[in-house]
Amino acid sequence: MAVPKKRTSTSKKRIRKNIWKRKGYSIALKAFSLAKSLSTGNSKSFFVRQTKINK
């Protein structure tokens, strides 16, 4: 089983953590943008069927 020889430095840990956070932030931003466009009806990539409720 592979075992790391030396301890990972604090700066390297911080860099990796920030990259991971940045990826999550950009994905969340895209998801929010898509949800916003779907709710306003400006989406060009999704076709949402509108159902009318008759009372």
From Swiss-Prot:
Record-level Gene Ontology MF annotations: structural constituent of ribosome
Signal sequence interval, chain numbering: none
Annotated protein name in UniProt: Large ribosomal subunit protein bL32c
Localization in the cell: Plastid, Chloroplast
InterPro entries: Ribosomal_bL32, Ribosomal_bL32_plant/cyanobact, Ribosomal_zn-bd
Pfam families: Ribosomal_L32p
UniProt entry keywords in alphabetical sequence: Chloroplast, Plastid, Ribonucleoprotein, Ribosomal protein
GO annotations of cellular component type: chloroplast; large ribosomal subunit
Gene: rpl32
